[in-house]
């Protein structure tokens, strides 16, 4: 069997960093990263980006050396992705924060609304209902992170956790401050508005969970294989007939319901910002599906049926 020689150079300086001799033809990029780490332990595999061209795209971990457009002496270019952190840790941190922060305002701990309101309770039923809905939402997210989601990428840059937490934690504090404020005014149309909003919220939360379960069943544990998601017998998954990312559709719907329930401007703004970001993600996933699968259903839109 003919072995390969792999030379790894810095993508910026072109400096030679490592020379690997007698590499198996069936070796994957993941295995090459592990070999590279032995000579440069400060760059663990998750921190490495290897590519065929200094300005090219990163090679996938599952790419096999002999299937790449290289000779028996291959040159790969290395870029440092920076310190990495697992997606599970990021999500748990992102979602635990809003859950805890919101409850601080709900229980009116000292130094928030003034001494006379310390640990007092709102007289409005909608305030207590909003707390239950908000808490349920983030507890659901935490449990899904631990037991449902399967991540195609194991890590993300450490710096992103600060940006993400600022977004989630900041908005949670902002909306919680107004919803739990002693001077909070209930929705204009009273109980009927709250009931309608609660129905929207519950339906969308069930829908979101159903989509996450369907996506989980689509990818075997430990696998990175992608398949076209289709509706199942669960009616909540039928939205797959019309959109590529119904989990985002239901997520936006949940926050719209919460905004109607609380009639609170910060919640409406959070819904708008979230919708904008999820639309970007949905369009990206939709393009990936179209590129990867020639038989992808043509009727589907990224996030909103027939529109967007």
Curated annotation (Swiss-Prot):
Keyword vocabulary terms for this entry: Acetylation, Endoplasmic reticulum, Fatty acid biosynthesis, Fatty acid metabolism, Lipid biosynthesis, Lipid metabolism, Membrane, NADP, Oxidoreductase, Phosphoprotein, Sphingolipid metabolism, Steroid biosynthesis, Transmembrane, Transmembrane helix
Subunit structure: Interacts with ELOVL1 and LASS2.
Function: Involved in both the production of very long-chain fatty acids for sphingolipid synthesis and the degradation of the sphingosine moiety in sphingolipids through the sphingosine 1-phosphate metabolic pathway. Catalyzes the last of the four reactions of the long-chain fatty acids elongation cycle. This endoplasmic reticulum-bound enzymatic process, allows the addition of 2 carbons to the chain of long- and very long-chain fatty acids/VLCFAs per cycle.
Transmembrane segments: 87-106, 125-147, 159-180, 190-216, 246-262, 265-292
Catalyzed reactions: a very-long-chain 2,3-saturated fatty acyl-CoA + NADP(+) = a very-long-chain (2E)-enoyl-CoA + NADPH + H(+); octadecanoyl-CoA + NADP(+) = (2E)-octadecenoyl-CoA + NADPH + H(+); (2E,7Z,10Z,13Z,16Z)-docosapentaenoyl-CoA + NADPH + H(+) = (7Z,10Z,13Z,16Z)-docosatetraenoyl-CoA + NADP(+); (2E,7Z,10Z,13Z,16Z,19Z)-docosahexaenoyl-CoA + NADPH + H(+) = (7Z,10Z,13Z,16Z,19Z)-docosapentaenoyl-CoA + NADP(+)
Transmembrane recorded as keyword: yes
Tissue: Expressed at high levels in brain and is also found at lower levels in several other tissues.
Membrane topology, from the record: Multi-pass membrane protein
Top-level taxon: Eukaryota
Alphabetical list of Gene3D superfamilies matching this protein: 1.20.120.1630, Phosphatidylinositol 3-kinase Catalytic Subunit, Chain A, domain 1
Name of the encoding gene: Tecr
The family this protein is said to belong to: Belongs to the steroid 5-alpha reductase family.
One MF term in the entry's GO annotations: oxidoreductase activity
Example of a GO cellular component annotation carried by this entry: endoplasmic reticulum membrane
Sequence positions bearing Phosphoserine: 58
Entry protein name: Very-long-chain enoyl-CoA reductase
Known EC number: 1.3.1.93
Record lineage: Eukaryota, Metazoa, Chordata, Craniata, Vertebrata
N6-acetyllysine PTM sites in chain numbering: 22, 60
């Amino acid at each position: 069997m003919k072995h390969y020689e792999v030379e790894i150079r810095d993508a910026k300086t072109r400096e030679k960093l490592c020379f690997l001799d007698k590499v198996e033809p069936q070796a994957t990029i993941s295995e090459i990263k592990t070999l590279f780490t032995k000579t440069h332990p400060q760059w663990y595999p998750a921190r490495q980006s290897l590519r065929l061209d200094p300005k090219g795209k990163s090679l996938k971990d599952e790419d096999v050396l002999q299937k790449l457009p290289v000779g028996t002496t291959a040159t790969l270019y290395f870029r440092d992705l920076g310190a990495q952190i697992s997606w599970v840790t990021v999500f748990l941190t992102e979602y635990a924060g809003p859950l805890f922060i919101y409850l601080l305002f709900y229980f009116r701990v000292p130094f928030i609304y003034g001494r006379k309101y310390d640990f007092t309770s709102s007289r409005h039923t909608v305030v207590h209902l909003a707390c239950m809905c908000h808490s349920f939402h983030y507890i659901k997210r935490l449990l899904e992170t631990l037991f449902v989601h399967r991540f195609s990428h194991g890590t993300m840059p450490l710096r992103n956790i600060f940006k993400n937490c600022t977004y989630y934690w900041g908005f949670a504090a902002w909306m919680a401050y107004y919803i739990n404020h002693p001077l909070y005014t209930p929705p204009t149309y009273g109980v009927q508005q709250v009931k309608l909003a609660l129905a929207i919220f519950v339906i969308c939360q069930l829908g979101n969970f159903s989509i996450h379960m369907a996506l989980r069943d689509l990818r075997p544990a430990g696998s990175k294989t992608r398949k076209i998601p289709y509706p199942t017998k669960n009616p909540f998954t039928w939205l797959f007939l019309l959109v590529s990312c119904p989990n985002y559709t239901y997520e936006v719907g949940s926050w719209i319901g919460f905004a109607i329930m609380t009639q609170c401007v910060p919640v409406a703004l959070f819904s708008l910002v979230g919708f904008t970001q999820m639309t970007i993600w949905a369009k990206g996933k939709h393009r990936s599906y179209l590129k990867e699968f020639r038989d992808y259903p043509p009727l589907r839109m990224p996030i909103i049926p027939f529109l967007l």
